[in-house]
Amino acid sequence: VPGVTLLETETGFAALVSPDSKIARDNARYQEQFGGEPITILLSGPLDSIFSTQNLAVLSDFEQEFSGNEWYHAINGPLTILQLARQEAEQAMRAFEEQLALAQEQAAAEARAAAAAMGCNEAEQEMAAQQARAEVLQKLQPQIEQMQLIGQPSLDNPAFIASVLYDAEGAVSPVMQSFIPDIAHALISVTPRGNMSDQESLQAVIDIETFFSSHPLDGVKVTVASAAKLVDAISNSIGNNIKVLLALSVAVMVLILVFTFRVRWRLLSLLMVGLSALWTFGLMGYLGVPVTMATMAALTILLGLGIDFSIQFHNRYQEEVARGKTIGEAMVTSISNMFPTIGIALLATIIGFITLYISEVPMIRQFGMMLATGIVISYIVALFLLHSIVYLGDKRIEIKKLKEAASKASGRIERILLRLGRLAIDHTLWIFIVAVAFAVGGGIVDHWLPTNTDYEDLMPQSTPALVELREMRQIVGIGGTVRLMVEAGDVTTPAVLGWLKDYGDNALSAHPEIISASSLATVVSTAAGGVIPAQPQIDAILESTPQSYLAPLLSGDRSMAGVSFNIEYIPMEETHDLLVLLQEEASPPSGVRVSPVGSLALGASTMDALVGARMTMNLICLGAILLVLLVVYRRLGSIIFTIIPVGAVIAWSSLDMYLIGIPLNPLTAVMGVLIIGICTEFMVLLMGRYEEEKRRGAPPQEAMVTAISKIGRAITTTALTTLGGFGVLIASSFVMIRDFGIATVISVFLSLLITITVMPGLIVWYDNWKIRRASR
């Protein structure tokens, strides 16, 4: 329990992208230079209210306070432009005053000289000079009146503010349009320090919200949106959903065990798996393994496999008691028969899960490690603790009563399974044909399954942070920003800037989803009239450009430049394709490197690492299990009949997901591992009991029918318990968890179906064929 309290949730990109991957290293260097993902502050209200003297004073205090905070890299907004305009206006006023004075003195000197040449006295010369000064003043009167109309360049002067905000026609001036999307909103962009942890990024947002809570803007609503808030909302949603749904799942499991597993201590298996899960998560806490979406999915597999271990041991014990054995004899027989069989299933599954450690995705590696550890703990608990509790509870009860109770509990389900087993064996061919048809269909449509790794589509759609973000996108008209990092010895040379300008122009024309492009080439070409000038002019432009404009575009040593493409909101799959095309189309000059960076690039990269590698992971996992079974069984038939159903169920699940419309997401992408674990165990248990019955002298058909009726009760109880418990997930408001619940129910049901209907007939047919061949 103390270890569980140490668990921390990780839902950011650290769970999806290895810090050693190229894109993660590139992104870290980019953020070190240009800061992290921007925090957007949306000011909603009439522009006159937003830019009132009182509110501008608050915004000025905000910039002063947060600009001096080491957590913030840069702040850009309308106030930034107003302050630059004020500085430029003050400089212009001083220059105008100096120009006016110089022009007046020059005109006065010329007038005085002309008067002297005409023989005028000193008084007449002074009058001529005064007249010349007045004429200069009159000539510049329009400019003077305009300056007087605007007044002193100050944030306390509404006329000056209006002159910066609006053009001559009264529309928002071009320089302000990037921060004022319409007449009722304004934007402030705050770039936090790069490479902050999720908690630090969230705190940076909270600090901003706290400032505006304590310094409210008059008549203006302030909304702060950021990726950090979305990550926090996802984390909270996962936690809250899992807590409620897990409680409901346990309640449903209790009901199913009560009605289907009619033995003494029928809820003991649930207690055992609960303890196993608690110990596993506690160990995670001590080892510092975070809770991610994948590790939450692992809980499903642990409960499914763990409860099966306990039910199988408990079921075999009840079977031996029903045969009239003493408690000690029943316990020994149960353990001696089930220990190796379940041990084989355990070993094969562990090896399969360990292979997940080759994944590039951190949370998949943690997923595999947690599963391997968890099922070992579940096995140990079922083997020792469950038997100890049952022994202590039953040893004082008369064996006759225990036998009667065990016999009564075994009757109904076993009779149903006996009939089902005979039916499956009698109709092997048709069942096999249908199974193969569905498997082929699943293999075909598997490549057609839609992919969705966009957290926004997978989380509860009514989450305030998501609603705010979508409202802001609608107002701003931008769905996201694709960022690229350009590196060279000097990115400010005409050759590099010329290529960068052409690259941006071509991207805008080739990809309609790109709304605008921003780069160092944009700044230079705009200042130079639409062209890239020679190096001296470039240096002069960069020297005169305010640092607030250059900060997100150029590093101090001129070796790195940032490029950003504002795009419409498109699915992550399309974003991934766009990034691939942008990289292919770059064709940079020699010595220039282009690398994708930023949250969209990181998110898109997970599609290949998580979803794209899904089939590879499944094949490696299956291959590892095959090797283990080969070492253990050393019989090709047993190995094939254990592996084939696993592959078939994976294909069936793909077909069902395609027909239902469930996409591949970070959770459903690991469903293959769940199927491999559950189905492998079911088949190993069935094959183990089948071989046991054959050793007792039963012919193949009778041996299989007995195996289905005996092992099938425990398998069916396991499947129904898992189905009922995790069917509750379907009610989740978290789209990703809901889809995972549906996929889990489908996978467990199909694993049960193939174990008791498809494979028994094939196994019996194969053994009968071997007998016939041997008798010839």
PLM regions and their residue ranges:
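Hydrophobic transmembrane alpha-helices
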Residues: L257, G274, P290-I311, I354, ...
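Pore- and gate-forming transmembrane helices of large, multi-pass membrane proteins
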Residues: N240-V244, L270, F309, A322-S359, ...
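Hydrophobic alpha-helical segments
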Residues: T280-I399, A731-S732
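Interfacial helix-loop-helix hairpins and adjacent transmembrane helices
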Residues: V1-P2, A28, V332, I380-A439, ...
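Interfacial segments of transmembrane alpha-helices in multi-pass membrane proteins
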Residues: N236-V291, I358-P362, T616-N665, A731
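Hydrophobic, glycine/alanine-rich multi-pass transmembrane helices and their short helix-loop junctions
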Residues: I256, G343-G393, L626-L630, W652-P663, ...
